[in-house]
Amino acid sequence: MEEVVLITVPSEEVARTIAKALVEERLAACVNIVPGLTSIYRWQGEVVEDQELLLLVKTTTHAFPKLKERVKALHPYTVPEIVALPIAEGNREYLDWLRENTG
């Protein structure tokens, strides 16, 4: 099954490092880097507001466990956001391409 994984990162440098590693290692077929994200969250009892970037990672359920570990190894956050969402439907040719380029 195909998935979109959401990952927030603190900088463009970190975004590019993670994106390139995932695609080069065939853990993802494509990664979109979306700038201009404002995140408001609770951390260590305080409400924090940060500027971040969002990675939209296209991968498969099979590749996700290795992808998650690779992101954790590259990510500067203690508890990085790594959330996988299933793709219910999509362009069949795109989903075929995604599977062919992951794993």
Swiss-Prot record:
Any one GO CC term of the record: cytoplasm
Gene Ontology MF term list: copper ion binding
Gene Ontology annotations of biological process type: response to metal ion
UniProt keyword list: Cytoplasm
Domain of life (superkingdom): Bacteria
Protein location: Cytoplasm
Subunit and interaction comment: Homotrimer.
Function statement: Involved in resistance toward heavy metals.
Family in the record: Belongs to the CutA family.
Protein name per Swiss-Prot or TrEMBL: Divalent-cation tolerance protein CutA
Species assigned in the record: Thermus thermophilus (strain ATCC 27634 / DSM 579 / HB8)
Gene: cutA
